[in-house]
Structures are given as structure tokens and as C-alpha cells.
Amino acid sequence: MAEFHRIIIDTDTAGDDAAALIIAAKNPNIEILGVTVLAGNVSLEQGAKNALAVLELIDDPTPVYMGASTTFSGEEKTCFSVFGADGMGEADLIHPRSKPQEKNAVDFILETVRANPGEIEIVALGPATNLALAIQRDRETMLKVKRIWAMGSAGFGPGNATPVAEFNVYKDAPAYKMMIELGVPLTILGLDMNNEFTWLYAEELQEMRSGNKIQQFMANCTRKLLEFKQRNGIPAVDFPDALAMACLAWPDFVEETTLCSASCITEPGETYGMLIFYKAGHTYDSMPTIVGKPNISVVSKVKSSEFVKRMNAVFLS
């Protein structure tokens, strides 16, 4: 029998976040208690509108809460999205009728975990600012999170924000450092799991434009991403956030994880935002004393060839 998950989704809602939301909302073994939003791919306000629009698309009443508009240190975030200015393909898709809740995202996270100790899992699809603010305010409560699932880091491969740093970590490395050092069980999916077998190609997207309302939405919200990828010689779009959600939603999807401890580079310079993983049981010539006990399961093998088929099945359900 599949494990039941009670989750909070923390997101900077763009196209691949939309796919992740849909995968979670349509899974009978997942209860989404709330969607918390922060600035990242797009501004906080735009991210909230995007989340509301996606939930309305699938008739899901999950409440949306607005969180951090700046970095953990209070600096304004320069938002950039390969999904277009609105994070959703600039296809005039985002006209939500509902509004976010008045309660702040950090308050919601802490109240929910406090009321359900050891039961709540958090799926972090964007920068970790909301989680860092929650940790700063009430670390003892955040230690009662059952598990954090995160799309972040380059895994054991190259980055996308820089050669060594992935976007979510790079946008607020001090916040990510706080998250990985909290000490609760943490599963991280990095960019190295995002390969050509997990992409949707231009021909498939064109077919989806004649499909149901979810398929049409997903094909259109990834329009700008496809243009960006094609300019770089790739005739397809990728879904790293949806891959991260798949690790939670589909129990057999993850074939291998590597237990690690980690450090996050927060000092300015070429390696800023790099997440360095130290494999448990592996002997290194020089092991930094700042690295704690292994508590991070880094996803190192998934059923890549199954991903698109399963995601499309969700869109059709």
C-alpha cells in the first residue's frame, strides 16, 4: 500500500511548477494542505497568480499563501524566467478568479507543522527563502517536519545559473544553507536527473495543443521555454520541478538515492550557490568540519523513460 503524504508545496510558480502542482493534486495518496509562494522565477505577486490559475484549471480549492518577496537577507530579487515574463509562456493564461489567503506563508507553514508534528512534508520547488524564514523564527517547530523534498542543486552534475550552481540555490544561497543544515530528513533532486528522456519535444507539445484543457495549458505555458531551448539547440522543454514531485508521488519512480551530507557556498565569487555533496562512508583527504551528519538523500537514479508517459497520463486524467 502506497504511503499517504500530507504536504505543503513551496513554489515560485512557473511552467514546470505548474506540472508539479497538477501531479500532486491528482494523486490520491497526497493531500496538499497549502501552496506557499515566494519570488524566484517571477515576482511574488505573479507567482501567487500563477499558482491560483493552475489550481483553478484543475478545480482544486487548495489555499495559496504569499511569502518572501526578497532574499533571506532582505535584498530585492531580480526575477528571471525562461518561461517568459509571467512565468507561463506569455500566452495570456493567467486570470485567476480567487485570491491568496491573508495569512503569511511563513505563519501558515509554522502553524501547520506545529499542529501536526512529525506528519507534514514540505516540497520545495523554488528558492528556500520561505523555509529559512520559518527556521529563523521557530527552529524547534521546523525540526518537527517529517521530510523536505527539494528540487535544488546540480546534483552530481553541472549547474544552470552558473557552471556549478543551480537556479534555486543561486537565487538565495544563505537560505538554502539554512535548509540543508536544519537536520530533518531531506530528499534532493538535482539537475543531473533532468535528461533527454524526461523532456517533452516540440512535436509532442504541438499535439498537446489539440488535447484537453490541461494539455493545452501546459503546451502554452511552456511556449517561451521552448523558444529559449531551441535558441540553444535543444528542441524540447524540461520539467525539473515536476521530476522532484514525481519522486514523492510515484513510489517506484526513484531507483537509487545516495546518502550525503552537504555544504552550500554562500561567499561571493565564482562558486556562490554551489551545493557540495559528501557521500556517506566515502573517505576524503580533507573533510570540512562544517559538514554535519548525513541526512540528505540525493536522488541518483530514476525511471527516466517512464516520466513523460506518466506525466501525460496525469494530464489526461
Residue ranges, per PLM feature:
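Metal-dependent C-N hydrolase catalytic cores
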Residues: 5-7, 48-115, 293-303, 312, ...
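Short, well-ordered secondary-structure micro-motifs
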Residues: 75-77, 160-161, 198-201
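Short, surface-exposed amphipathic charged segments that create phosphate/polyanion-binding patches used
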Residues: 77-84, 162-166, 205
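A residue-level signal for conserved active-site and pocket-lining positions in enzyme catalytic cores
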Residues: 64, 179, 245
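Conformational coupling and interaction surfaces
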Residues: 2-4, 22-31, 170, 174, ...
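Active-site histidine-anchored catalytic micro-motif
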Residues: 2-53, 92-195
